Protein backbone atom coordinates (compact mmCIF):
# COMPACT_ATOMS: atom_id res chain seq x y z
CA UNK A 1 0.00 0.00 0.00
CA UNK A 2 1.44 3.37 -0.95
CA UNK A 3 0.80 6.71 0.68
CA UNK A 4 -0.12 9.79 -1.29
CA UNK A 5 1.27 13.13 -0.17
CA UNK A 6 -0.36 16.25 -1.54
CA UNK A 7 1.62 19.48 -1.23
CA UNK A 8 -0.15 22.80 -1.38
CA UNK A 9 1.76 25.92 -2.35
CA UNK A 10 1.13 28.62 0.21
CA UNK A 11 1.20 32.31 -0.61
CA UNK A 12 0.84 35.58 1.21
CA UNK A 13 -2.20 37.68 0.40
CA UNK A 14 -1.35 40.48 -2.03
CA UNK A 15 -2.65 43.51 -0.13
CA UNK A 16 -1.83 45.87 -2.99
CA UNK A 17 -4.05 43.82 -5.30
CA UNK A 18 -6.78 43.74 -2.66
CA UNK A 19 -6.57 47.52 -2.29
CA UNK A 20 -6.90 47.99 -6.05
CA UNK A 21 -10.04 45.86 -5.97
CA UNK A 22 -11.49 48.27 -3.39
CA UNK A 23 -10.44 51.34 -5.41
CA UNK A 24 -12.04 49.87 -8.55
CA UNK A 25 -15.13 48.71 -6.62
CA UNK A 26 -14.49 45.10 -7.59
CA UNK A 27 -16.02 42.51 -5.26
CA UNK A 28 -16.80 45.30 -2.77
CA UNK A 29 -19.95 44.83 -0.73
CA UNK A 30 -20.17 48.13 1.13
CA UNK A 31 -20.04 51.81 0.17
CA UNK A 32 -18.93 54.20 2.91
CA UNK A 33 -19.96 57.85 2.74
CA UNK A 34 -17.55 59.69 5.05
CA UNK A 35 -18.68 63.18 6.07
CA UNK A 36 -17.03 65.89 8.14
CA UNK A 37 -17.56 69.65 8.40
CA UNK A 38 -15.66 70.36 5.18
CA UNK A 39 -15.94 67.48 2.74
CA UNK A 40 -17.54 64.17 1.86
CA UNK A 41 -15.55 61.20 0.58
CA UNK A 42 -17.18 58.08 -0.88
CA UNK A 43 -15.21 54.83 -0.94
CA UNK A 44 -15.89 51.17 -1.62
CA UNK A 45 -14.69 48.48 0.77
CA UNK A 46 -15.03 44.84 1.74
CA UNK A 47 -17.03 44.12 4.87
CA UNK A 48 -14.79 41.23 5.87
CA UNK A 49 -11.72 43.51 5.82
CA UNK A 50 -13.47 46.21 7.85
CA UNK A 51 -14.89 43.65 10.29
CA UNK A 52 -11.49 42.08 10.93
CA UNK A 53 -9.63 45.38 11.21
CA UNK A 54 -11.38 47.41 13.90
CA UNK A 55 -13.88 47.16 16.77
CA UNK A 56 -16.21 49.82 15.31
CA UNK A 57 -17.03 47.86 12.15
CA UNK A 58 -16.98 44.55 13.99
CA UNK A 59 -19.78 45.77 16.25
CA UNK A 60 -21.60 47.48 13.39
CA UNK A 61 -21.76 44.41 11.15
CA UNK A 62 -22.36 41.90 13.97
CA UNK A 63 -25.49 43.60 15.35
CA UNK A 64 -29.08 43.67 14.18
CA UNK A 65 -28.82 47.37 13.37
CA UNK A 66 -30.02 48.33 9.92
CA UNK A 67 -26.48 49.35 8.91
CA UNK A 68 -25.39 45.72 9.23
CA UNK A 69 -27.39 44.76 6.14
CA UNK A 70 -27.11 47.98 4.16
CA UNK A 71 -24.79 48.25 1.19
CA UNK A 72 -24.32 52.00 1.65
CA UNK A 73 -23.63 53.66 5.01
CA UNK A 74 -23.28 57.34 5.89
CA UNK A 75 -20.80 57.99 8.72
CA UNK A 76 -20.16 61.34 10.38
CA UNK A 77 -16.42 61.36 11.14
CA UNK A 78 -13.89 63.81 12.70
CA UNK A 79 -11.93 64.11 9.44
CA UNK A 80 -13.05 62.25 6.32
CA UNK A 81 -9.61 62.41 4.65
CA UNK A 82 -7.80 60.96 7.68
CA UNK A 83 -10.56 58.40 8.21
CA UNK A 84 -10.23 57.28 4.59
CA UNK A 85 -6.47 56.90 4.99
CA UNK A 86 -6.94 54.72 8.07
CA UNK A 87 -9.23 52.42 6.10
CA UNK A 88 -6.59 52.31 3.36
CA UNK A 89 -4.24 51.18 6.10
CA UNK A 90 -6.48 48.14 6.64
CA UNK A 91 -5.39 47.17 3.12
CA UNK A 92 -1.71 47.62 3.97
CA UNK A 93 -1.39 51.04 2.37
CA UNK A 94 0.63 53.95 3.77
CA UNK A 95 -1.00 57.17 2.67
CA UNK A 96 0.59 60.59 3.18
CA UNK A 97 -1.25 63.44 4.86
CA UNK A 98 -1.80 65.30 1.60
CA UNK A 99 -2.58 68.98 2.02
CA UNK A 100 -3.39 68.71 5.72
CA UNK A 101 -0.91 70.37 8.09
CA UNK A 102 1.15 67.64 9.84
CA UNK A 103 0.06 68.74 13.34
CA UNK A 104 -3.59 68.73 12.25
CA UNK A 105 -3.22 65.32 10.66
CA UNK A 106 -1.69 63.91 13.86
CA UNK A 107 -4.48 65.27 16.08
CA UNK A 108 -7.26 64.12 13.75
CA UNK A 109 -5.63 60.69 13.47
CA UNK A 110 -6.12 60.33 17.22
CA UNK A 111 -9.77 61.39 16.94
CA UNK A 112 -10.45 58.98 14.09
CA UNK A 113 -8.68 56.05 15.72
CA UNK A 114 -10.62 56.68 18.90
CA UNK A 115 -13.83 56.72 16.83
CA UNK A 116 -12.91 53.34 15.35
CA UNK A 117 -11.86 51.87 18.68
CA UNK A 118 -8.27 51.39 17.53
CA UNK A 119 -5.25 51.47 19.79
CA UNK A 120 -3.77 54.92 20.39
CA UNK A 121 -0.04 54.99 21.07
CA UNK A 122 2.24 57.85 22.04
CA UNK A 123 4.23 57.37 18.83
CA UNK A 124 1.31 58.88 16.90
CA UNK A 125 2.10 62.22 18.55
CA UNK A 126 5.89 62.15 18.36
CA UNK A 127 7.48 65.52 17.52
CA UNK A 128 4.08 67.22 17.60
CA UNK A 129 4.20 71.01 17.55
CA UNK A 130 0.87 72.84 17.27
CA UNK A 131 0.38 76.53 16.42
CA UNK A 132 -0.30 78.65 19.52
CA UNK A 133 -3.84 79.38 18.37
CA UNK A 134 -4.59 75.62 18.25
CA UNK A 135 -3.21 74.72 21.67
CA UNK A 136 -6.73 74.06 22.99
CA UNK A 137 -7.13 71.39 20.29
CA UNK A 138 -4.09 69.63 21.74
CA UNK A 139 -5.59 69.85 25.23
CA UNK A 140 -8.72 68.06 24.02
CA UNK A 141 -6.59 65.27 22.58
CA UNK A 142 -4.56 64.85 25.79
CA UNK A 143 -7.82 64.62 27.74
CA UNK A 144 -8.87 61.88 25.33
CA UNK A 145 -5.70 59.79 25.57
CA UNK A 146 -5.26 60.42 29.30
CA UNK A 147 -2.89 62.59 31.29
CA UNK A 148 0.41 60.81 31.74
CA UNK A 149 4.11 61.74 31.58
CA UNK A 150 4.02 61.81 27.78
CA UNK A 151 0.94 64.04 27.74
CA UNK A 152 2.50 66.43 30.25
CA UNK A 153 5.59 66.66 28.04
CA UNK A 154 3.41 67.52 25.04
CA UNK A 155 1.51 70.21 26.90
CA UNK A 156 4.61 71.85 28.36
CA UNK A 157 6.39 71.79 24.99
CA UNK A 158 3.44 73.39 23.19
CA UNK A 159 1.86 75.75 25.71
CA UNK A 160 1.96 79.34 24.35
CA UNK A 161 3.97 81.86 26.36
CA UNK A 162 0.90 84.10 26.73
CA UNK A 163 -1.59 81.32 27.48
CA UNK A 164 -4.08 82.01 30.27
CA UNK A 165 -3.12 79.30 32.76
CA UNK A 166 -6.20 79.99 34.89
CA UNK A 167 -8.21 78.17 32.20
CA UNK A 168 -6.62 74.91 33.36
CA UNK A 169 -7.80 73.00 36.41
CA UNK A 170 -5.75 73.20 39.60
CA UNK A 171 -5.25 69.44 39.45
CA UNK A 172 -3.72 69.65 35.97
CA UNK A 173 -1.65 72.69 36.92
CA UNK A 174 -0.17 70.86 39.90
CA UNK A 175 0.71 67.86 37.72
CA UNK A 176 2.31 70.10 35.09
CA UNK A 177 4.19 72.02 37.78
CA UNK A 178 5.63 68.83 39.27
CA UNK A 179 6.55 67.63 35.79
CA UNK A 180 8.74 70.70 35.21
CA UNK A 181 10.83 69.91 38.30
CA UNK A 182 13.98 67.83 38.10
CA UNK A 183 17.06 67.34 40.27
CA UNK A 184 20.67 68.39 40.01
CA UNK A 185 23.69 68.84 42.25
CA UNK A 186 25.09 72.27 43.04
CA UNK A 187 28.68 72.27 44.21
CA UNK A 188 31.76 74.41 44.46
CA UNK A 189 34.53 72.99 42.27
CA UNK A 190 37.65 73.32 44.36
CA UNK A 191 40.02 72.88 41.41
CA UNK A 192 38.34 75.46 39.19
CA UNK A 193 37.25 77.79 42.03
CA UNK A 194 33.76 78.13 40.61
CA UNK A 195 30.22 77.09 41.49
CA UNK A 196 28.90 74.42 39.12
CA UNK A 197 25.76 72.41 38.53
CA UNK A 198 25.90 68.71 37.74
CA UNK A 199 23.33 66.88 35.63
CA UNK A 200 22.77 63.67 37.60
CA UNK A 201 21.52 61.81 34.53
CA UNK A 202 24.52 62.31 32.24
CA UNK A 203 27.15 63.38 34.82
CA UNK A 204 27.87 66.57 32.87
CA UNK A 205 28.84 69.68 34.84
CA UNK A 206 28.74 73.29 33.76
CA UNK A 207 29.51 76.58 35.46
CA UNK A 208 26.86 78.72 37.12
CA UNK A 209 26.96 82.33 35.99
CA UNK A 210 27.25 83.63 39.52
CA UNK A 211 29.11 86.80 40.52
CA UNK A 212 32.85 86.42 40.14
CA UNK A 213 35.25 86.04 43.04
CA UNK A 214 32.78 84.31 45.34
CA UNK A 215 34.87 82.66 48.08
CA UNK A 216 35.14 78.97 48.84
CA UNK A 217 32.26 77.64 51.00
CA UNK A 218 33.14 76.26 54.39
CA UNK A 219 31.29 72.92 54.35
CA UNK A 220 28.11 71.13 53.37
CA UNK A 221 26.50 71.85 56.76
CA UNK A 222 27.09 75.56 56.14
CA UNK A 223 25.44 75.61 52.71
CA UNK A 224 21.75 75.66 51.86
CA UNK A 225 19.47 76.10 48.86
CA UNK A 226 15.86 77.32 48.81
CA UNK A 227 14.05 76.03 45.72
CA UNK A 228 11.03 78.30 46.22
CA UNK A 229 13.15 81.45 45.89
CA UNK A 230 16.10 80.08 43.84
CA UNK A 231 18.46 81.16 46.60
CA UNK A 232 21.83 79.64 47.42
CA UNK A 233 23.28 80.61 50.81
CA UNK A 234 26.59 79.59 52.33
CA UNK A 235 29.25 80.56 54.84
CA UNK A 236 32.93 80.85 53.98
CA UNK A 237 35.94 80.26 56.24
CA UNK A 238 35.97 83.94 57.26
CA UNK A 239 32.50 83.83 58.86
CA UNK A 240 30.85 85.64 55.96
CA UNK A 241 27.41 84.73 54.67
CA UNK A 242 26.66 84.95 50.94
CA UNK A 243 23.15 84.65 49.52
CA UNK A 244 22.89 84.40 45.72
CA UNK A 245 19.87 84.13 43.43
CA UNK A 246 20.94 81.47 40.93
CA UNK A 247 18.08 82.34 38.56
CA UNK A 248 19.05 86.01 38.22
CA UNK A 249 22.73 85.43 39.18
CA UNK A 250 22.55 88.34 41.63
CA UNK A 251 24.18 88.55 45.05
CA UNK A 252 21.28 89.43 47.36
CA UNK A 253 23.00 89.41 50.77
CA UNK A 254 26.55 89.61 52.06
CA UNK A 255 26.79 89.55 55.86
CA UNK A 256 30.06 89.65 57.79
CA UNK A 257 30.96 88.44 61.28
CA UNK A 258 28.52 85.54 61.39
CA UNK A 259 28.60 83.42 64.56
CA UNK A 260 30.12 79.95 64.55
CA UNK A 261 27.39 77.86 62.99
CA UNK A 262 26.89 74.10 62.85
CA UNK A 263 24.08 74.13 60.30
CA UNK A 264 21.95 76.60 58.32
CA UNK A 265 18.80 76.62 56.21
CA UNK A 266 16.94 79.37 54.35
CA UNK A 267 13.34 79.18 55.52
CA UNK A 268 12.16 82.19 53.51
CA UNK A 269 13.55 84.86 51.22
CA UNK A 270 14.84 86.91 54.16
CA UNK A 271 15.13 84.48 57.08
CA UNK A 272 17.90 82.04 57.90
CA UNK A 273 17.62 79.24 60.47
CA UNK A 274 20.91 78.61 62.29
CA UNK A 275 22.27 76.16 64.84
CA UNK A 276 25.05 77.63 66.97
CA UNK A 277 26.27 78.01 70.55
CA UNK A 278 23.71 75.64 72.06
CA UNK A 279 20.79 77.47 70.51
CA UNK A 280 18.56 77.63 67.48
CA UNK A 281 18.04 81.07 65.98
CA UNK A 282 16.28 82.75 63.06
CA UNK A 283 18.30 85.58 61.53
CA UNK A 284 16.53 88.37 59.64
CA UNK A 285 18.81 88.96 56.65
CA UNK A 286 17.39 92.43 56.04
CA UNK A 287 18.20 93.77 59.50
CA UNK A 288 20.91 91.29 60.53
CA UNK A 289 18.97 90.82 63.78
CA UNK A 290 17.59 87.66 65.38
CA UNK A 291 13.84 87.29 65.10
CA UNK A 292 13.69 84.30 67.42
CA UNK A 293 16.05 82.07 69.34
CA UNK A 294 15.74 78.97 71.48
CA UNK A 295 18.30 77.76 74.01
CA UNK A 296 18.83 74.00 74.03
CA UNK A 297 20.93 71.81 76.29
CA UNK A 298 23.16 70.30 73.64
CA UNK A 299 23.82 70.88 69.93
CA UNK A 300 26.38 68.09 69.74
CA UNK A 301 24.11 65.90 67.63
CA UNK A 302 25.14 62.48 66.44
CA UNK A 303 23.03 63.04 63.31
CA UNK A 304 20.88 65.92 62.14
CA UNK A 305 18.65 66.34 59.09
CA UNK A 306 16.30 68.93 57.65
CA UNK A 307 12.96 67.41 56.64
CA UNK A 308 11.03 70.28 55.11
CA UNK A 309 10.32 72.65 58.01
CA UNK A 310 11.41 70.06 60.57
CA UNK A 311 14.90 69.78 62.04
CA UNK A 312 15.60 66.23 63.20
CA UNK A 313 18.26 66.06 65.92
CA UNK A 314 19.61 62.67 66.93
CA UNK A 315 21.50 61.96 70.15
CA UNK A 316 22.77 58.58 71.30
CA UNK A 317 19.45 57.45 72.79
CA UNK A 318 16.85 59.94 71.57
CA UNK A 319 15.55 61.88 68.58
CA UNK A 320 14.17 65.42 68.85
CA UNK A 321 12.01 67.06 66.19
CA UNK A 322 11.90 70.87 66.05
CA UNK A 323 9.83 73.21 63.90
CA UNK A 324 12.40 75.57 62.34
CA UNK A 325 9.81 78.29 61.64
CA UNK A 326 8.56 78.81 65.20
CA UNK A 327 11.46 77.03 67.01
CA UNK A 328 9.12 74.76 68.97
CA UNK A 329 10.00 71.24 70.07
CA UNK A 330 7.44 68.99 68.39
CA UNK A 331 8.28 65.71 70.14
CA UNK A 332 11.03 63.43 71.42
CA UNK A 333 11.45 59.75 70.57
CA UNK A 334 13.38 57.90 73.29
CA UNK A 335 15.05 54.54 72.72
CA UNK A 336 16.59 51.94 75.04
CA UNK A 337 19.54 51.20 72.79
CA UNK A 338 22.17 53.41 71.20
CA UNK A 339 21.24 54.76 67.76
CA UNK A 340 23.76 53.89 65.04
CA UNK A 341 21.99 55.20 61.92
CA UNK A 342 19.20 57.68 61.15
CA UNK A 343 17.43 58.63 57.93
CA UNK A 344 14.47 60.63 56.59
CA UNK A 345 12.29 59.86 53.57
CA UNK A 346 12.66 62.00 50.44
CA UNK A 347 9.10 63.33 50.81
CA UNK A 348 9.84 64.44 54.40
CA UNK A 349 7.07 62.32 55.93
CA UNK A 350 9.01 59.55 57.72
CA UNK A 351 12.06 59.10 59.91
CA UNK A 352 13.73 55.78 60.68
CA UNK A 353 16.64 54.60 62.78
CA UNK A 354 18.67 51.50 63.56
CA UNK A 355 19.96 50.80 67.07
CA UNK A 356 22.90 48.76 68.37
CA UNK A 357 20.65 45.74 68.93
CA UNK A 358 19.78 45.96 65.20
CA UNK A 359 16.23 47.01 65.94
CA UNK A 360 14.69 49.09 63.15
CA UNK A 361 12.02 51.73 63.97
CA UNK A 362 10.06 53.98 61.63
CA UNK A 363 7.80 56.90 62.65
CA UNK A 364 5.46 59.36 60.97
CA UNK A 365 6.94 62.85 61.21
CA UNK A 366 3.48 64.44 61.26
CA UNK A 367 1.84 62.31 63.95
CA UNK A 368 4.75 60.62 65.73
CA UNK A 369 3.07 57.23 65.25
CA UNK A 370 5.40 54.23 65.25
CA UNK A 371 4.64 52.72 61.85
CA UNK A 372 7.13 49.86 61.76
CA UNK A 373 9.41 48.08 64.21
CA UNK A 374 11.51 45.06 63.29
CA UNK A 375 14.85 43.39 63.84
CA UNK A 376 17.28 43.57 60.94
CA UNK A 377 18.51 40.21 59.69
CA UNK A 378 22.12 39.31 60.49
CA UNK A 379 23.04 39.23 56.81
CA UNK A 380 22.44 42.99 56.63
CA UNK A 381 24.56 43.88 59.63
CA UNK A 382 28.01 42.73 58.55
CA UNK A 383 30.30 45.73 58.03
CA UNK A 384 27.22 47.96 58.42
CA UNK A 385 27.51 51.61 57.32
CA UNK A 386 23.95 52.93 57.46
CA UNK A 387 20.36 52.96 56.22
CA UNK A 388 18.48 55.25 53.89
CA UNK A 389 15.04 55.37 52.36
CA UNK A 390 15.06 54.67 48.65
CA UNK A 391 14.35 57.92 46.84
CA UNK A 392 10.63 58.43 46.24
CA UNK A 393 9.76 55.01 47.71
CA UNK A 394 8.95 54.93 51.42
CA UNK A 395 8.48 51.16 51.45
CA UNK A 396 12.08 50.34 50.53
CA UNK A 397 15.08 50.79 52.81
CA UNK A 398 18.59 50.78 51.36
CA UNK A 399 21.10 49.18 53.73
CA UNK A 400 24.71 49.86 52.90
CA UNK A 401 27.72 47.95 54.14
CA UNK A 402 31.30 47.96 52.91
CA UNK A 403 30.72 45.14 50.43
CA UNK A 404 27.06 45.23 49.38
CA UNK A 405 24.02 47.41 48.87
CA UNK A 406 20.81 45.78 50.08
CA UNK A 407 17.29 46.90 49.21
CA UNK A 408 14.81 45.76 51.83
CA UNK A 409 11.05 45.98 51.19
CA UNK A 410 9.40 46.82 54.50
CA UNK A 411 5.95 45.59 53.43
CA UNK A 412 6.91 42.23 51.89
CA UNK A 413 10.10 41.45 53.79
CA UNK A 414 11.82 40.70 50.48
CA UNK A 415 15.40 41.82 49.97
CA UNK A 416 17.78 42.12 47.03
CA UNK A 417 21.45 42.98 47.04
CA UNK A 418 24.34 43.80 44.77
CA UNK A 419 27.99 43.31 45.51
CA UNK A 420 30.07 46.44 45.18
CA UNK A 421 32.91 46.57 42.74
CA UNK A 422 35.00 48.86 44.94
CA UNK A 423 35.88 49.34 48.58
CA UNK A 424 33.78 51.58 50.84
CA UNK A 425 36.12 51.60 53.80
CA UNK A 426 36.12 55.41 53.96
CA UNK A 427 32.32 55.90 53.74
CA UNK A 428 30.78 57.52 56.81
CA UNK A 429 27.37 58.55 55.47
CA UNK A 430 25.28 58.43 52.32
CA UNK A 431 21.95 59.52 50.86
CA UNK A 432 19.67 58.26 48.10
CA UNK A 433 19.26 61.04 45.52
CA UNK A 434 17.29 59.23 42.79
CA UNK A 435 15.90 55.73 42.37
CA UNK A 436 19.34 54.49 41.32
CA UNK A 437 21.86 57.08 42.48
CA UNK A 438 23.42 57.42 45.92
CA UNK A 439 25.68 60.17 47.19
CA UNK A 440 28.43 58.87 49.48
CA UNK A 441 30.21 61.05 52.03
CA UNK A 442 33.66 59.70 52.70
CA UNK A 443 36.45 60.71 55.00
CA UNK A 444 40.18 60.43 54.71
CA UNK A 445 43.12 61.50 56.82
CA UNK A 446 45.80 63.55 55.13
CA UNK A 447 49.01 64.86 56.62
CA UNK A 448 50.00 68.43 55.90
CA UNK A 449 52.89 67.87 58.28
CA UNK A 450 54.21 64.56 59.63
CA UNK A 451 52.56 64.97 63.02
CA UNK A 452 49.44 66.89 61.93
CA UNK A 453 46.88 64.60 60.30
CA UNK A 454 43.96 66.48 58.75
CA UNK A 455 40.55 64.85 58.41
CA UNK A 456 38.80 65.76 55.16
CA UNK A 457 35.45 64.83 53.66
CA UNK A 458 35.05 63.95 50.02
CA UNK A 459 32.00 62.87 48.04
CA UNK A 460 31.33 60.13 45.50
CA UNK A 461 28.19 59.68 43.40
CA UNK A 462 27.45 56.06 42.50
CA UNK A 463 24.89 54.30 40.29
CA UNK A 464 23.34 51.30 42.08
CA UNK A 465 22.63 49.56 38.76
CA UNK A 466 26.09 49.41 37.23
CA UNK A 467 28.15 50.83 40.14
CA UNK A 468 29.80 53.39 37.95
CA UNK A 469 30.87 56.24 40.15
CA UNK A 470 32.09 59.80 39.95
CA UNK A 471 34.30 61.64 42.41
CA UNK A 472 33.04 65.14 43.16
CA UNK A 473 35.87 67.56 43.74
CA UNK A 474 34.05 69.41 46.48
CA UNK A 475 33.18 69.30 50.17
CA UNK A 476 29.70 70.78 49.81
CA UNK A 477 27.45 69.08 47.21
CA UNK A 478 23.82 70.19 47.45
CA UNK A 479 21.19 67.93 45.90
CA UNK A 480 18.50 70.39 44.78
CA UNK A 481 15.39 70.73 42.67
CA UNK A 482 15.14 73.07 39.70
CA UNK A 483 12.72 74.04 36.93
CA UNK A 484 13.43 72.49 33.54
CA UNK A 485 11.05 74.94 31.89
CA UNK A 486 9.89 78.49 32.59
CA UNK A 487 6.32 77.19 32.45
CA UNK A 488 6.90 75.76 35.92
CA UNK A 489 7.61 79.21 37.38
CA UNK A 490 4.48 80.65 35.76
CA UNK A 491 2.34 77.82 37.09
CA UNK A 492 3.83 78.31 40.54
CA UNK A 493 2.78 81.96 40.41
CA UNK A 494 -0.79 81.03 39.43
CA UNK A 495 -1.08 78.35 42.11
CA UNK A 496 0.29 80.78 44.69
CA UNK A 497 -2.65 83.11 44.10
CA UNK A 498 -5.24 80.45 44.88
Curated annotation (Swiss-Prot):
Q: Which domain of life is it from?
A: Viruses
Signal peptide residues on this chain, from the entry's feature table: none
Family matches, as Pfam families: BTB
Query: Which InterPro entries has this protein been placed in?
Result: BTB/POZ_dom, SKP1/BTB/POZ_sf, WD40/YVTN_repeat-like_dom_sf
Q: Which residues form the BTB domain?
A: 28-99
Q: Which family does it belong to?
A: Belongs to the mimivirus BTB/WD family.
User: What is the protein name stated in its UniProt record?
Assistant: Putative BTB/POZ domain-containing protein L788
- In its UniProt entry, the species of origin is given as Acanthamoeba polyphaga mimivirus (APMV)
